[in-house]
Amino acid sequence: AAEYPGYLFAAVGIQPNSAAEANETDFAVIEDLAGYPGVRAIGETGLDCYWDDTPIEMQHDYFDRHMQLCRDTALPMVIHMRESGDLIVDQLKRQTNVPPGIMHSFTGDWECANSCLDLGLHVSFAGMVTFKKSDALRDVARRIPEDRLLVETDSPYLSPEPFRGKRPNEPARVEHTLRCLAEVRGVSAKALA
């Protein structure tokens, strides 16, 4: 972001799966980086109950710390969720002031999505929504208000159909995810873009 100002932007944070490897100095670096001009968000932060690389209590602590950093800097947060939607919503509801942000690569159910919307968050979908067995996720995407819906790659992972399993995922493939979302919403990709 510093090398290409105005063209490339950054999010800074300690991803939940990496929190066990982090220390106070690392978080201080994140706090410092958050003040750089090219930084536009804090994260990924959040919770991951799929991998057991970091104890859940430590993930909760870092999630709280990231949210406080968002409040201190007025930057939005990018929330990682993997098999942790209910825990994330519960933790967000305990906040007196939920920072703005996005539910990154959303995979939860409608109840979780609706709670996130009620908390003022945007909901973002990656290639997983295009997978054949993702009917329930597509139904959630269909119900998200257009002004709160985002489309992403989650590069280098989660390439959409017809590239599923091929890595690295890349920005050019987001078109396939967009087309899928447009189809389930009954609009053209151009209109949704």
List each language-model region with its residue ranges.
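Mid-domain alpha/beta scaffold segments of enzyme catalytic cores
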Residues: 1-193
